[in-house]
């Protein structure tokens, strides 16, 4: 952790130097070349910006394909991209530990947008035995006891999209009409996705599911489900032996048939739970980023969330 703090400190110094160099030229004063330059920390934010901005924006997703956003640290090239952006979109809730270090240097040059503004946050409680509150506080992550995975709830994703739309309108008011229309179309698709999840949950036999790490708190909260997580808010957290026994006991109690594993993270501990419970593996996509293969296949937020809905429906089946 100390090494990571030191690296972020060095990044902050580099950021200040880059921004001071760009500030005099006015490189980030607006869409002078006809398009807004947008940098986004997470894939969902980049996708929403592309859908809303359309032909008026150029969007850069900072996290490389196949990299877990929890572990991402900006490179010097990323620093230059952010300093040259008209808008920087970040999720907030502590997921991007580097943002606070660079915000002060960017202010005045770049419009900095917390895409989760207005979303009611879920706080975790290690003393709860069930639901999205089940995780160990001993292994605190940068986002503390608040779940940052708001984009997995289509309703909260709609709020994030609205925040992005408002930012684009503020930075580029002459294209307000296009941004509003594109947002309305995106909002309708998110409403449809919300209905799809509701129908999936209503048809399900059970209300509990086991997942390798606690990324589905907002999804569980939205649809009245019980998330049983093997590890905490960060996939790198290792549960204590006591927590592991509790997870196995709870999974058996709810007669789960499947355990949901994230696509970018392989958890040996979760696989141990799977064997103990006698469950089968299923994937759930956290959507923090896409792999190169997924990009090549034309996958996007909606195609992957629809697959998540299908797999969640299976995971809610009971023995």
Regions found by a protein language model. Name each.
Residues 9-20:
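Bacterial N-terminal signal peptides
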Residues 2, 7, 21-319:
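Extracytoplasmic metal-acquisition and chelation regions
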């Amino acid at each position: 952790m100390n090494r990571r703090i030191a690296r972020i400190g060095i990044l902050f110094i580099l950021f200040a130097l880059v921004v001071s160099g760009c500030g005099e030229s006015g490189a980030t004063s607006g869409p002078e070349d006809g398009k807004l330059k947008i940098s986004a920390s997470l894939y969902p934010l980049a996708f929403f910006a592309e859908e809303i901005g359309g032909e008026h924006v150029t969007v850069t997703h900072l996290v490389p394909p196949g990299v877990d956003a929890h572990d991402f640290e900006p490179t010097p090239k990323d620093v230059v991209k952010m300093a040259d952006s008209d808008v920087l979109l970040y999720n907030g809730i502590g997921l991007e530990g580097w943002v606070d270090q660079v915000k002060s240097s960017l202010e005045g040059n770049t419009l900095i947008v917390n895409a989760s503004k207005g979303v009611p946050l879920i706080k975790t409680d290690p003393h709860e035995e069930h639901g999205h509150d089940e995780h160990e506080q001993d292994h605190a992550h940068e986002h503390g006891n608040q779940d940052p995975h708001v984009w997995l709830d289509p309703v909260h994703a709609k709020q994030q999209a609205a925040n992005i739309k408002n930012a684009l309108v503020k930075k580029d008011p002459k294209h307000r009409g296009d941004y509003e229309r594109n947002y309305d179309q995106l909002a309708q698709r998110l409403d449809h996705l919300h209905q799809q999840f509701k129908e999936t949950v209503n048809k399900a036999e059970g209300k509990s599911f086991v997942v390798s790490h606690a990324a589905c708190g907002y999804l569980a909260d939205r649809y009245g489900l019980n998330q049983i997580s093997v590890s905490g808010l960060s996939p790198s957290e290792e549960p204590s032996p006591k927590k592991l026994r509790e997870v196995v006991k709870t999974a058996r109690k709810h007669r789960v048939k499947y355990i949901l594993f994230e696509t970018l993270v392989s958890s040996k501990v979760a696989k141990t739970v799977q064997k103990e419970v006698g469950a089968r593996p299923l994937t759930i996509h956290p959507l923090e980023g896409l792999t190169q293969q997924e990009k090549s296949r034309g996958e996007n937020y909606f195609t992957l969330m629809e697959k998540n809905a299908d797999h969640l429906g299976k995971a809610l089946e009971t023995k």
